Structures are given as C-alpha cells and as structure tokens.
Regions:
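Non-catalytic terminal/accessory segments
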Residues: 1-197
Length: 197
C-alpha cells in the first residue's frame, strides 16, 4: 500500500472505500496502543473524483504540504479534449499566506532602493515559491504573481514622479521588460502590470 508522510501528516492510497475504512480502523488501534489518536478533523476519506470516477462522495479534496488536491478541468495534449482529472495546485491557504508575506514587504515604500536591489532582495524568495508551488498547475499562481507587479508599479510611481500617468508608465514598463526580461524571477511567467489610478 502506497503512502506519503511528512512530520505528523500522511496520505494513504486505497483502492476502495471499504479498504480505506479498514486501514483507518487499523491505524486508530495502532495509534491508541501507543497513547496517540488520529486527528478527528484532519482524518478523512477522500474520493479522488475524475472523468473515470464519477460517484458522489462527501469529500473530494484535501490539502497536503501546501498543495490542494481536487478535481480540475484538464485538456488533452494529444487531441485537445477537455476532461476532469484529480490534480494538485497551490492551496488557497498557501496563496493567502504568500500574499500576506508580500504585503508585509511594503515594497512600494522602499523608494530609496533601486530596481536591481529590489530584484536581488525578492528574487530568491519568489523563485523558491515558483519552484515549489509551480511544479503542478502553475497558472494558479499567476494572479498572485501579478500582484507583485502591482507593488512594483506602485513603487515606480512613487519613486519617479514622471511615471504617474498611465501612458508614461506603460512606455517605461514595456521598455524595462524588453531590456531586462529576467530582472525579476516571476517575469518568466507573468510580465503584465496592473494599473490602479
């Protein structure tokens, strides 16, 4: 029987609901024999619903190591057919946590810092997130990465008064991205800016 474990979290793969309930019962007995017990809220049987498994079940998603596993719409690379597969992507909780972290940077207030210094500061962190959470369904991170561009936009408009109009800022941003396409790690995936008037 396959399983993954990290610290006190584990995912056990079962073929049928009956098998899952038997494993649950056996684990409960084992844990109790050493004075422990399974977490009542976190211990669940999850139905990995997809195009081939279409039954109705109470729980069809779970979170593990910052990823949410759930049914997702997919497209066949062979013939373009749309189907449902059970796949991981960055979890909403992890996204919220990273967004909070970026807000705490208060990047737009660091106007004594230049672009190169900003990039040197945030790139190792953002690249780490991209490498870890972007392994599967990385598009789920795009709106979050665009938010980093929003903070960069605010930083530039505060630092350079001439960039406070949309037209001038757009020319500056597009020129910067054309000259230095790899300046910020997340530009490998998302280069557009968001303008807030």
């Amino acid at each position: 029987m396959e399983f993954e474990r990290f610290a006190d979290d584990a995912v056990v793969h079962c073929v049928t609901e009956r098998q899952a309930r038997e494993v649950w019962a056996a684990l409960s007995v084992r844990m109790e024999s050493v004075g422990l017990r399974l977490h009542p809220d976190k211990t669940k049987i999850i139905y990995c619903k997809d195009s081939n498994r279409r039954a109705e079940f109470a729980d069809t998603s779970f979170t593990f190591l910052g990823y949410m596993f759930r049914p997702r719409e997919s497209k066949s690379s062979r013939n373009g057919t749309i189907f449902t597969s059970f796949q991981p992507a960055i979890s909403p909780v992890a996204l919220k946590d990273k967004s909070r972290q970026v807000r705490r940077w208060r990047m737009h207030r660091k106007t004594t810092t230049n672009l190169e210094e900003l990039a040197e500061w945030i790139n190792p962190i953002v690249r780490g997130w991209m490498n870890y959470y972007g392994e599967f369904n990385r598009f789920e991170m795009y709106s979050f990465l665009r938010r980093i561009n929003t903070y960069l936009t605010r930083w530039a408009r505060k630092k350079f008064k001439r960039l406070r109009t949309y037209r001038r800022f757009k020319v500056w941003w597009e020129g910067l991205v054309a000259r230095e396409p790899a300046m910020f790690a997340h530009w490998a995936w998302v280069r557009v800016f968001s303008w807030i008037g």
